[in-house]
């Protein structure tokens, strides 16, 4: 049974919901799945004033956790078209894993959230994928077998590089049914790929 980690950072809960959907898809494909988040770097008082979602249930990950998994799916909200500082700070600590080749050949994937439709979804996915490729991971995206990406009747997230959602500038838009379907589909593909590689 493949072991999958869904590792995320979420300020307002949008990525948390996407992480849960990815985990659901991976479990549905027979994987053992853990959801963990990276540490918050914003001081608690400031985070409260900014209305960050501080009651997230996922445990905090450590860098040492990563090598226990066959697949790691990394998600974060976008900051100016790139990875959040919280996720970057966590991934920047993986140098020891890189030196030992501890993640070489494992499965990696990315998911993201932006405030607007053109707010840097693909560049954020690429900034995650770049880290994963430097760690030697095999990347699984979100292919067009997810029919929701072809939807032209509403604004939807999703790219061939990974599942995404759009939060709106004030955070009022929650992941849509199509966004969550894409996340589940990507989770399923990650789990199936890891199972083929690791049994």
UniProtKB/Swiss-Prot annotation:
Sample GO molecular function, one term: FMN binding
Cellular component aspect of the GO annotation: membrane
Residues annotated to bind FMN: 10-15, 78-80, 113-119, 134
Positions with a binding annotation for NAD(+): 12
Gene3D superfamilies named in the record: 3.40.50.360
Cofactor note: Binds 1 FMN per monomer.
Annotated residues for binding of substrate: 98
Domain Flavodoxin-like as annotated: residue spans: 4-190
Enzyme class: oxidoreductase
Cofactor(s), by name: FMN
Signal sequence bounds: none
Keyword Oxidoreductase among record annotations: yes
Keywords assigned: Flavoprotein, FMN, NAD, NADP, Nucleotide-binding, Oxidoreductase
InterPro entries: Flavodoxin/NO_synth, Flavoprotein-like_sf, Flavoprotein_WrbA-like, FMN_Rdtase-like_dom, NQO
Catalysis performed (reactions): a quinone + NADH + H(+) = a quinol + NAD(+); a quinone + NADPH + H(+) = a quinol + NADP(+)
EC number: 1.6.5.2
Similarity remark: Belongs to the WrbA family.
Protein name, per record: NAD(P)H dehydrogenase (quinone)
Organism field: Paraburkholderia phymatum (strain DSM 17167 / CIP 108236 / LMG 21445 / STM815) (Burkholderia phymatum)
